[in-house]
Design a protein with these regions (language model features):
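Hydrophobic, glycine-enriched assembly/anchoring segments
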Residues: 249-299
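Conserved, mostly hydrophobic/aromatic
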Residues: 16, 29
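Long, charge-rich C-terminal accessory regions
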Residues: 127-266
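Active-site-adjacent beta->alpha loops and helix N-cap segments on the catalytic face
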Residues: 37-41, 94-102, 120-126
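Leucine-rich repeat
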Residues: 63-72, 120-128, 145
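A broadly used, surface-exposed interaction patch
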Residues: 45-108
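Catalytic beta/alpha-barrel core
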Residues: 3-7, 30-33, 52-59, 85-95, ...
Length: 299
């Protein structure tokens, strides 16, 4: 089972909604709620498609909804009559046993998981609880800690996207992960990542000097990300022209190499044929769609 993690923002949710529904037999999105004007509307899109997902209750970052916010605006509102989801709690170095106990005791009708973002001091206590999954972000917790937990509910998350400060700095290709190939041999029941966004989960961005298309290409043993960058890398003007430059590089690569083509790639092909710039948020959405399709294709 594949567990991609991302912010529940407009284009991230739209990427999920645009995927072939059959893929969700093997995919469980983990969503970090994010306040914006379409907050509830976006979650409702997943409800309307009956997509199973996991909601993170306690992502501690300024401006993000609190546990009470999520209770009031989602669990007791948009999700009041929806049962096809579960909850997860994100551990920090200062997470207390009382917090975990409160998480366990509340919303008793919903299954619950723990996301180990930082190592919890009372690991044995966590291991003894009846959680659906123990989800480990491997970049931040070590194997000795992971080994304290039983293997029949482990999910291994790796942040494979190597974010650069500037689009112009991306190499032509970078390794992403072999997690999809190795997780079972390490006793996992699932694996995941932060798609092509990365664990940094930036809240926004402005016009870039260079435009980049990040295209995942997954094979049996490893997934790579190809970075197609516009030829023009100076100034913030003409993002549409820069997108077409990057798209030309991408299509040329696809035409000459073996790449699985799903909805994401086919949409890029259509944009190339029409020489159309859909906007940078759509470029992001298509990159997420392709990433998930690529991973699903080799599972």
């Amino acid at each position: 089972m594949y567990f991609p993690i991302f912010l529940a923002k407009k284009y991230d949710i739209l990427a999920l909604c645009d995927l072939d529904e059959k893929l969700f037999k093997n995919i469980t999105p983990i969503l970090i709620p994010h306040y914006h004007k379409d907050f509830k509307k976006n979650i409702k899109k997943l409800v309307d498609k009956n997509i199973y997902f996991i909601i993170v209750l306690n992502f501690k970052r300024l401006g993000y909804p609190t546990i009470n916010d999520i209770e009031n605006d989602l669990i007791n509102d948009v999700l009041k009559d929806y049962t096809n989801y579960s909850l997860a709690y994100w551990t920090y170095n200062d997470t207390s046993k009382l917090e975990i106990q409160n998480f366990i005791n509340q919303n008793g009708n919903l299954e619950k998981s723990i996301i180990h973002r930082e190592e919890f001091s009372k690991a044995q206590y966590l291991s003894n609880q009846n959680f659906k999954y123990h989800i480990f972000i491997e970049n931040y917790v070590n194997q000795d800690y992971i080994d304290l937990f039983v293997s029949n509910d482990r999910i291994y998350i790796q942040d494979g996207f190597k974010r650069q400060k500037k689009n112009a700095d991306y190499p032509k290709i970078s390794d992403f992960s072999d997690n999809h190939y190795t997780y079972k041999s390490r006793g996992g029941v699932g694996f995941g990542d932060f798609t092509i966004i990365g664990h940094d989960l930036k809240d926004g961005g402005g016009a870039a000097y260079a435009v980049a298309i990040h295209m995942t290409n997954a094979r049996k043993k490893i997934a790579n990300v190809h970075h197609f960058v516009s030829d023009s890398i100076a100034g913030r003007e003409n993002p549409g022209g820069k997108f077409i430059e990057a798209l030309n590089h991408m299509i040329r690569f696809i035409d000459n190499n073996a790449v699985f083509e799903g909805i994401g790639i086919n949409t890029y092909r259509d944009l190339h044929k029409r020489k159309h710039f859909p906007g940078l948020p759509i470029n992001k959405k298509l990159g997420i769609i392709n990433h998930i399709e690529q991973i699903a294709n080799i599972m």
